[in-house]
């Protein structure tokens, strides 16, 4: 009976998944139900939750991941400074920093020749390190304290110390703006902008149609879905949210960065970009220590991922192959200058796009928009779930069927779009300034020539004395940048190693999983079979011996017979 029970038990072991079942269903269900961090599926809170797992900085709020996988959000304090000259600070002592969870609004004030922040203290708390341990006790992000008397005014500096965070408040915002300003100065020093003479500005072109960069992002996303999930992309809608884009960031496990030198001057520099980190748990981090220098650029520490390893960086570095550096306050950078300090991880960007299946009814503008009528919620599918990336990070080999090169292209497209947008806005400002100077100069000259007639307006009998020329400089700049982007793509494609990977990798990766499984079975299978056969033979020999001994009686020895 015992041997039969063991045989049945061994047979049933084949039917047990032992926890290695495909987690795609569970991961996709969590992704669909709770959404992205900045969606705030868990609602709003007035205080940072004490049991939070991690936190992500969003535009105007901070999202906290709870143990039930919901994201709860807390609004950051608002600046209520009155217009006009700053008032005197109502404080006798000034602190270096105050955490943003200890007040709901703040103002700017002046004391002497310096500007400070002031607010009413709602609670007191001691400062300390963040809840997320990055590696060791010396690499934690320090949180600001809340010292003072509850209900009274407090004042603090407008610049936070190095590696000190106020929880997404005005100090963190000032730090991000300072980093952006310094990166723009570095970019202008490396790449001087093309200047037009005021009298040689290109003439007006035709009006621009739909933004070409948005169409490129949608086309790249469609091609990526076509390679990974053909059944979904056959009939679906790709939906982009209105408002400022917040791309998704997924881990990049390859340390794809290069040290910038004089020979490598083609590093793409973009302004700091706010992103939503997804699927980060353990990552390889890049660390640059602080030397207490006034010229340091504090990028902060990552607060959404643990660091399994840390690489010390001492010089300027550039992200390559469409990757970005993700640092404190989940801000993305493509270039880290010489004097940067902080803790960052490498990531790849994906657009914040939702997918609607073709059989899902999509509402169109109708009378419902004017007369309220409850409408059924649309079932959106997040892009990460549609691509199978969520399961790929869990199983490791499940998502190998999607080509890595396609993710690189899509991330590269997003980075280029941000750089183009920044350059275009700068050109718009320069155009307005140059046109204003030309108009004023010409106006003065014409007024002098027609002074006897009362000026140029009275001489021409015009009702409107000002005219702004709509120049085509912005359109020419966009065209030039698009040509430059195409040139860089051709340079990347001319690399034999990258071209070889792009041509063979998508076809080899789908067979890699079954091939590794077959090799594993051929290597370990004979050993397991031999052990199982030996075990069964031993049990059969024992049973055979027991059956034979039942037909005989044991003979008594001479001593037992005498007794």
Curated annotation (Swiss-Prot):
TM spans (from-to): 504-524
Stretches in topological domain Cytoplasmic: 525-563
Motif (CXXC): 236-239
Residue window of motif YXXL motif: 552-555
Chain ranges on the Extracellular side, renumbered to this chain: 19-503
Disulfide bonds listed in the record: 236-239, 236-465, 457-464
Region (Fusion peptide): 380-400
InterPro entries for the chain: TLV/ENV_coat_polyprotein
Signal peptide: 1-18
Motif CX6CC: chain residues: 457-465
Ranges in coiled-coil conformation: 401-451, 461-497
Pfam families in alphabetical order: TLV_coat
Region (Immunosuppression): 440-456
Annotated lipid attachment (S-palmitoyl cysteine): 527
Keywords associated with the record: Cleavage on pair of basic residues, Coiled coil, Disulfide bond, Fusion of virus membrane with host cell membrane, Fusion of virus membrane with host membrane, Glycoprotein, Host cell membrane, Host membrane, Host-virus interaction, Lipoprotein, Membrane, Palmitate, Signal, Transmembrane, Transmembrane helix, Viral attachment to host cell, Viral envelope protein, Viral penetration into host cytoplasm, Virion, Virus entry into host cell
Post-translational modification: Specific enzymatic cleavages in vivo yield mature proteins. Envelope glycoproteins are synthesized as an inactive precursor that is N-glycosylated and processed likely by host cell furin or by a furin-like protease in the Golgi to yield the mature SU and TM proteins. The cleavage site between SU and TM requires the minimal sequence [KR]-X-[KR]-R. The R-peptide is released from the C-terminus of the cytoplasmic tail of the TM protein upon particle formation as a result of proteolytic cleavage by the viral protease. Cleavage of this peptide is required for TM to become fusogenic. The CXXC motif is highly conserved across a broad range of retroviral envelope proteins. It is thought to participate in the formation of a labile disulfide bond possibly with the CX6CC motif present in the transmembrane protein. Isomerization of the intersubunit disulfide bond to an SU intrachain disulfide bond is thought to occur upon receptor recognition in order to allow membrane fusion.
Gene Ontology CC: host cell plasma membrane; membrane; viral envelope; virion membrane
Glycosylation-annotated residues: 113, 219, 229, 264, 282, 292, 306, 312, 321, 339, 469
One Gene Ontology biological process: fusion of virus membrane with host plasma membrane
Site annotation Cleavage: residues: 376-377, 546-547
Role according to the record: The surface protein (SU) attaches the virus to the host cell by binding to its receptor. This interaction triggers the refolding of the transmembrane protein (TM) and is thought to activate its fusogenic potential by unmasking its fusion peptide. Fusion occurs at the host cell plasma membrane. The transmembrane protein (TM) acts as a class I viral fusion protein. Under the current model, the protein has at least 3 conformational states: pre-fusion native state, pre-hairpin intermediate state, and post-fusion hairpin state. During viral and target cell membrane fusion, the coiled coil regions (heptad repeats) assume a trimer-of-hairpins structure, positioning the fusion peptide in close proximity to the C-terminal region of the ectodomain. The formation of this structure appears to drive apposition and subsequent fusion of viral and target cell membranes.
Subunit: The mature envelope protein (Env) consists of a trimer of SU-TM heterodimers attached by a labile interchain disulfide bond.
Domain notes: The 17 amino acids long immunosuppressive region is present in many retroviral envelope proteins. Synthetic peptides derived from this relatively conserved sequence inhibit immune function in vitro and in vivo. The YXXL motif is involved in determining the exact site of viral release at the surface of infected mononuclear cells and promotes endocytosis.
Protein name in the entry: Envelope glycoprotein
Protein's organism: Baboon endogenous virus (strain M7)
Lineage: Viruses, Riboviria, Pararnavirae, Artverviricota, Revtraviricetes
């Amino acid at each position: 009976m015992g041997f039969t029970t063991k045989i049945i038990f061994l047979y049933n072991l084949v039917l047990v998944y032992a926890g290695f079942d495909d987690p795609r269903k569970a991961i996709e269900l969590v992704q669909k139900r709770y959404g992205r961090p900045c969606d705030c599926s868990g609602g709003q809170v007035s205080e940072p939750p004490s049991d939070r797992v991690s936190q992500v900085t969003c535009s105007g709020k901070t999202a906290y991941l709870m143990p039930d996988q919901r994201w709860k959000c807390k609004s950051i304090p608002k600046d209520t400074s009155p217009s006009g000259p700053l008032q005197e600070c109502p404080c006798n002592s000034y602190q270096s920093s105050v955490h943003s969870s200890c007040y709901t609004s703040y103002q700017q004030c002046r004391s002497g020749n310096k500007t400070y922040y002031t607010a009413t203290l709602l609670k007191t708390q001691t400062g300390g390190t963040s809840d997320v341990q990055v590696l060791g006790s010396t690499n934690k992000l320090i949180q600001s304290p809340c010292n003072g008397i509850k209900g009274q005014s407090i004042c603090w500096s407008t610049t936070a110390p190095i590696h000190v965070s106020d929880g997404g408040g005005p100090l963190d915002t000032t730090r991000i703006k300072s980093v952006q300003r310094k990166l723009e100065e570095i970019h202008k020093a490396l790449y001087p902008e093309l200047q037009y003479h005021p009298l040689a500005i290109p003439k007006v072109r035709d009006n621009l149609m739909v933004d070409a960069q948005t169409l490129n992002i949608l086309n790249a996303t469609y091609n990526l879905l076509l390679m990974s999930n053909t059944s979904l992309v056959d009939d679906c809608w790709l939906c982009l949210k209105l408002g400022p884009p917040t791309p998704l960031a997924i881990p990049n496990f390859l340390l794809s960065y290069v040290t910038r030198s004089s020979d490598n001057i083609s590093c793409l520099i973009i302004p700091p970009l706010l992103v939503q980190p997804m699927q980060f748990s353990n990552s390889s981090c890049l660390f640059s220590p602080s030397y207490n220098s006034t010229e340091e650029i504090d990028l902060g520490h990552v607060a959404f991922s643990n660091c399994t390893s840390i690489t010390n960086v001492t010089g300027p570095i550039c992200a390559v192959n469409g990757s970005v550096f993700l640092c404190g306050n989940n801000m993305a950078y493509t270039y880290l200058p010489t004097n940067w300090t902080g803790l960052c991880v490498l990531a790849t960007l994906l657009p914040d796009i939702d997918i609607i299946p073709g059989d899902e009814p999509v509402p169109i503008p109708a009378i419902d928009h004017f007369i309220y009528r409850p409408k059924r919620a649309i079932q959106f599918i997040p892009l990460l779930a549609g691509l199978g990336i969520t399961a790929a990070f869990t199983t490791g080999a499940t998502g190998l069927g999607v080509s890595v090169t396609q993710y690189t292209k899509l991330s590269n497209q997003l980075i280029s779009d941000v750089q183009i947008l920044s350059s275009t806005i700068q050109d718009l400002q320069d155009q307005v300034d140059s046109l204003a100077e030309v108009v004023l100069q010409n106006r003065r000259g014409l007024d002098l020539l027609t002074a006897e007639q009362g000026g140029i307006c009275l001489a021409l009998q015009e009702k409107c004395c000002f005219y702004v020329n709509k120049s085509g400089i912005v359109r020419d700049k966009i065209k030039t940048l698009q040509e430059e982007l195409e040139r860089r793509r051709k340079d990347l494609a001319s690399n034999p190693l990258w071209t070889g990977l792009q041509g063979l990798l998508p076809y080899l990766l789908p067979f890699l999983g079954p091939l590794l499984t077959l090799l594993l079975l051929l290597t370990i299978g004979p050993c397991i079979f031999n052990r199982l056969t030996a075990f069964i033979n031993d049990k059969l020999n024992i049973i055979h011996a027991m059956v034979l001994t039942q037909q005989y009686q044991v003979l008594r020895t001479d001593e037992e017979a005498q007794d």
